Structure formats: structure tokens, C-alpha cells
Amino acid sequence: MARYVFITGGVVSSLGKGIAAAALGALLQARGYRVRLRKLDPYLNVDPGTMSPTQHGEVFVTDDGAETDLDLGHYERFTGRSATRTDNITTGRIYKNIIDKERRGDYLGATVQVIPHVTNEIKDFVTEGNQDYDFVICEIGGTVGDIEAMPFMEAIRQLGNDLPRGTAVYVHLTLMPYIPAAGELKTKPTQHSVKELQALGIHPDILLVRADREIPEAERRKLSLFCNVRPSAVIQALDVANIYDVPMAYHKEGLDDEVLAAFGIEPAPKPRLDQWEEVCNRIRTPEGEVTIAIVGKYTGLKDAYKSLIEALHHGGIANRVKVKLEWIESEVFEKEDPAPYLEKVHGILVPGGFGERGSEGKIHAARFARERKVPYFGICFGMQMAVIEAARNLADVPDASSTEFGPAKEPVVGLMTEWVKGNELQKRTAAGDLGGTMRLGAYKAALKKGTKISDIYGSTDISERHRHRYEVNIDYKDRLESCGLVFSGMSPDGVLPETIEYPDHPWFIGVQYHPELKSRPLDPHPLFASFIEAATEQSRLV
């Protein structure tokens, strides 16, 4: 039978509930337990697929094609377990499900209310499909007191009574701020947060307290007394240099021991943390440093590229080097020469994106990398812009463009209207809805034997995750290949270009998919490991 850990947050948002959940999952896994992580999001969007990346951050795509919260990326990276669409739900999705049921008559004429219908829908989501797991960790988005989160708080309160005794534990993540004028950490915000949680009928078993310095023992006892938790259950969560230190830091503070004790699991299996120790050691003691320029259009919010950032650092871990990131707004290159910005970097990465804004700047970045022999990694939109650059400057197609930007004389990149998923033909139109209509999730690709990318993967058959509506037009393939650009990977039916490269370039690869979504600190993605290796070689030349 599965045991449930509910993680709530208080005082302020962005305290790191997702990292805490992921780290706890990793620690329980290290003891041999089977762990599942799920995220409950209070916003009214059905999913984050149509939300602005500068507001919400990255949309994390699962193998089965769900557009989910970026915290699922943390879950995957820390545990190595691939998430599914059933690991994330929003208030919007819950209400949509309920309205669909009401229209079908599933409620037999009953008045549909928040209690019991909304709360039952949440409880069903939390408890379904967990028979193969020892622990289910549920992160509740938002902060205690948010009106949007109230149905979720009520649902997990009810679950404390519905589930068998001893199978539900509540962890509350709070902030203990330091007041310079007083010269001390303050417990009052945490006390009030816990009181608000208790007023909702939820009594936390464990307090995970964020702080920027050691919490004195006297303050821990104070929190224990006023928040009604055991002294050992007041766990300090100190700031760390990087997120991959968190599992080891929380283990040192006893979080996993306290969770297991709350379930009555004593003595617990000893954890095997040697892999995490090795990762932390490689991060702390790099043997070199490389600088990677990220030429993007959402650089104002780094969370828009969360998985990408982490995958680059994974590449650094694989090569024992520190990866320094230079963020460049692509629109800059539409007005200025890219050379002063890119001459000293060791690699250029152009990530995914949508829309015409900044596209010409990305094309200029691709040209600089091609001509100057700087390692270039184009992902999704970044591959498309590299192909347009090749068409304009190598294949004598000066009007090459994408239909995403409007009518194009030479549509080198165009809207996909049909593609095959499994054995089914998928179709969409330009006038259709935006939500959930892209080529989403894991698709197979066939790599050309003897190409750089097939050597990197060590295989000609791969599966990677996609999120795009536009694709390189296969009608231009022959003209582009005659100029030296190789289409090194295609969809299994040979219709959709998946990867490109220049054989005479030290490292110039474009991929239509998002390899960053499958990279892990304990298992870096081969493309990122190879890209950082090439950047390390470049660093010896610059």
C-alpha cells in the first residue's frame, strides 16, 4: 500500500517546494523505495501549454505528450523516473472534467459543488494508479492562504481521514527571515503560516524551514513548541550553492529519517548516496570552465529555459567542467554585429521559441557559428533558424523564411498539417485551437549511420520529446544537402527532418526535438555531454 507525503508552502511563494519534493523522492529512492511525485496546480488554465513563458516559465513535456509544470522536470531529474500526464493536474483541468461529467448527466441531477465534487475529483487524482509505489509525494502549488488553493487544502485534509491510519504525512515548507536590524532570525512568519494551515484542519508533521544561516537550537525549540511538532521534526533547509546539493543537505539534516519515522518505519533501510556524492564532488571541483552563449527571446525569465540550463550543467558534470552561461537577447543581433558578443564564447546555443520576434537575430547567431567554426547547438526553433540561414547564404534562396512569420515566398519552414503518432494520423489546421495541438511527446527518429549525431548516440534509432507546430520543409532537402548541410536524422517514415549537421564543422548540430527534457544529473544527455566536450576543446583555441 502506498504512503502519501503532502508538501505545502507558507509565508512566501518560490521557496522551492518542487526541489524539496524531488530531493525527498531521491532520498527515498536511495533507500530502495519506489516513489511517485505529483503536482497539484491551483491556476485555472487547463495546462500551461498556452501560458507565456515569461510568466509561468518552462512548459515541461512528458513522453506521453502532456504539457506540464516545470516542477515535473525537477522530479524527473532527481529521481530518473519519467513523469506522465497523470502526474500533474490544474484547477482548470479539474473544473473541465467536472463540467463534462455534469453535461453527460454523470451526477444524476445533483447540485454540483466544491464539496464534495471538486474535492472528490482532486482526491481521485491523488490516489489513483499508485498500487506499484511505496511512496507518493504530492506537491500543492501556491501558498497557504491563497484562495485558489483552498479546494486542494480541503481535499488533502479529507485524505488524512480517508486513508488508512499512518499512511499520510504533511510537510510544511516555510521561510525564517533574517532581520539585519534585530540581528536575528524570526519565527513569527512560520508560526502564523502554521496557524493558518491548522485552521484549515491540517496539522503538519514536519516543518522544513528555509533560512540563509544556521537556525539556533533555541529557535527550533520555539518553533516546535508553538507549531506543535516534535523538536526533531523542525528541519532547517539552508541555502546551498546548487540544487544538486539539496538531497545530501536534507539527508544531513534528517528529512528522510524524519519522514520515515512519521510513518513508523524504524529501522529504515540505509540510503545509498554514492552517486549523489560524486555529482556534488564534480560540481565543487571542476577541472576547467567553458562559456556558452544562449541566444534566446525569453531571457528575462531564466525559468523559461529551466531544463536547458540544467542539461548544460549536466554536460559540465559529464566533462568535469564548470559551465558559465552568457544570456543574449536575440533581438540585439538584429541591430548590432554579433561578433563582439560571441567572439570569446566557447559554444553557442539557440533554444526553442515561438513567433517572429528575435528570429533574425538567431539566424545571425547561426551564421556566426557556422563561419567562425564555433560549436553550435540549435534546438527546435534553433534548428529551423539554422536551416533558413543555410538556405539564404549557401543555397541561394534569399527569400527563405518560415510560414510562422506570415506568407513566405520560399517556405523553408512550414506548418505541419499531418503527422503520424503511433499508428494514427494526426491533423491540424492553421485556424485550430492552440492548446494541445502541437506535435507533443516522444517520437522515434532514424539517424543516418556514420553521422556525428549517430556516433554521439551510439545508435541510429532514438526516441526524443517534441513540442512544435512547424517543421523544416522536406522539399528543400536536396538543395540544402548539395550545399553541405546534412539531414542526419528523419522521422521513421522519412517525411519529417529531425536533425541536421555540417560534417566539415567541429560541432554544428540542430535537432527538432528537445533533448534537454531527458537529461539527468546522474545520466547526462549524450548531446549535451558532447556539446560541452566540443566547447571544452574550443576553449583551448580562444
UniProtKB/Swiss-Prot annotation:
Gene Ontology molecular functions: ATP binding; CTP synthase activity; glutaminase activity; identical protein binding; metal ion binding
Residues bound to Mg(2+): 71, 139
Binding site for L-glutamine: 353, 381-384, 404, 469
EC supergroup of this enzyme: ligase
Xref: InterPro entries: Class_I_gatase-like, CTP_synthase, CTP_synthase_N, GATASE, GATase1_CTP_Synthase, P-loop_NTPase
Record region (Amidoligase domain): 1-265
Subunit structure: Homotetramer.
Family: Belongs to the CTP synthase family.
Name under which the protein is recorded: CTP synthase
Lineage, opening ranks: Bacteria, Pseudomonadati, Pseudomonadota, Alphaproteobacteria, Hyphomicrobiales
